[in-house]
Amino acid sequence: MKRSDKELHLSKVEGLFSKFKYFIIANFQGMVANDFFSLRKELKMANSGLMVVKNSLSRIALKKMGREELSAKFFGSIFIVYSDDIILISKILAKFMKDNKSKISLLCAYDSNEILDSEKVLYFASLPSLRELHAQIMSMISYNIPVRLALCLKALGNKE
């Protein structure tokens, strides 16, 4: 890899680490181009992304940004999934892992100031996403309004 290519890759990695709040670092073995294509496509629909990284350059970027505690996780064939919604990308990766048993293994996740283990990532995958929570709240509100109105009208009728 030429020095100019390394500098470009380094700036891309630094840009990802500074732009996005959440990262999941995963190891991949035996993934073919179609696997990456389908995973990237799903992530893109969720306003997220995936980047295969060069370990040594990632360590340099992390050191520059003061996140050296993550450097130990960069060994082997690594990719980073980045987003502003960790639950959504956790769900996508968990689904991909379920469909493709031995192709990826989660190493850790990074949440602004904290390193999260792979079990925590899988726990996040079991939680409802922000959009699903909004839908649940709206359905509870829209269900309760007519019931409360009926109870109020009934109470008024009983009062008179």
Curated annotation (Swiss-Prot):
One MF annotation (Gene Ontology) recorded for this entry: large ribosomal subunit rRNA binding
Keywords associated with the record: Ribonucleoprotein, Ribosomal protein, RNA-binding, rRNA-binding
GO CC aspect terms: ribonucleoprotein complex; ribosome
GO BP of this protein: translation
SUPFAM superfamilies attached to this UniProt entry: Ribosomal protein L10-like (SSF160369)
Keyword Heme among record annotations: no
A family per Pfam: Ribosomal_L10
Family indicated by similarity: Belongs to the universal ribosomal protein uL10 family.
Function in brief: Forms part of the ribosomal stalk, playing a central role in the interaction of the ribosome with GTP-bound translation factors.
PANTHER family from the UniProt entry: 39S RIBOSOMAL PROTEIN L10, MITOCHONDRIAL
Binding partners and assembly: Part of the ribosomal stalk of the 50S ribosomal subunit. The N-terminus interacts with L11 and the large rRNA to form the base of the stalk. The C-terminus forms an elongated spine to which L12 dimers bind in a sequential fashion forming a multimeric L10(L12)X complex.
HAMAP family in the cross-refs: Ribosomal_uL10 (MF_00362)
Annotated protein name in UniProt: Large ribosomal subunit protein uL10
